[in-house]
């Protein structure tokens, strides 16, 4: 296939390489308490994503990403917490948000298991990454002499998440942090497709984890307990 016959595709390819899958991100924080009442200890924080049978849930890999991005050993793995609290955090019975937690914690068995685990702070993550737009086309052929793909495809994705920090002991919301990232990915192809990916979910994870680190590092007040 003669590339000179397709200047439009070559121009789009050059544009895609120049843009390089750019991502724009926004982080916002609303603090409803001046500071944590008690500094986080080992295993005293759990990060949970929304899970429910209605098909809407926060991706487990995003929750894992945030947990692993937080420095230190204060974070209890989500899976370990869910297993210890079985069956109350399974998809069919899990709370839909922090507003449902007081009712759940009124159950003495639930409260005791959480206390035994030593978990003080719950970070509830709600949100998802979605494809918002896509355009272009690509055609691939296979022949005895070889094959290849020709075309240009773009797609835009938006990663939007909100983390609510909840004190399980005082049963109050300490603050909320939102992380939004959006970007456009490109896949030009002249024989071989070359994906140029905008990693919006990774950017949203990094921004949310960094802000949570700052939030959780705020000096604890003296009236801890």
Task: List where the protein language model places each region.
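Bacterial N-terminal signal peptides
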Residues: 11-21
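Surface-exposed short loop/turn segments
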Residues: 98-169
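Bacterial N-terminal signal peptides that target proteins for export
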Residues: 2-12
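Solvent-exposed, acidic/flexible segments
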Residues: 55-63, 99, 103-107, 154, ...
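C-terminal/domain-edge helix-coil "capping" segments
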Residues: 22-43, 52, 129-131, 150-225
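Structured loop/turn residues at beta-strand edges in well-structured enzyme cores
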Residues: 17, 40, 117-120
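A structural "domain/chain start" motif
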Residues: 22-104, 115, 214-225
């Amino acid at each position: 296939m003669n590339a000179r016959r397709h200047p439009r595709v070559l121009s789009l390819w050059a544009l895609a390489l120049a843009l390089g899958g750019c991502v724009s991100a926004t982080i916002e924080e609303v603090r409803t308490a001046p500071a944590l009442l008690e500094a986080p200890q080992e295993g005293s924080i759990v990060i949970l994503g929304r899970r429910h049978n209605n098909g809407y849930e926060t991706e487990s890999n995003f929750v894992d990403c945030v947990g692993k991005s937080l420095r230190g050993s204060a974070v209890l793995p989500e899976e370990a917490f869910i297993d210890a609290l079985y069956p109350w955090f399974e998809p069919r019975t899990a709370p839909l948000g922090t507003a449902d937690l007081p009712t759940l914690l009124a159950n003495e068995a639930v409260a005791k298991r959480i206390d035994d685990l030593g978990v003080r702070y719950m970070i509830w993550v709600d949100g998802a990454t979605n494809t918002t737009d896509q355009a272009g086309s690509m055609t691939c052929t296979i022949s005895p002499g070889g094959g290849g793909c020709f075309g240009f495809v773009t797609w835009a994705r938006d990663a939007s998440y909100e983390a609510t920090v909840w004190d399980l002991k005082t049963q109050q919301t300490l603050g909320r942090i939102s992380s939004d990232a959006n970007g456009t990915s490109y896949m030009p192809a002249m024989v071989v497709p070359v994906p140029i990916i905008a990693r919006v979910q990774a950017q949203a994870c990094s921004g949310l984890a960094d802000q949570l680190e700052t939030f959780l590092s705020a000096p604890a007040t003296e009236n801890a307990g």
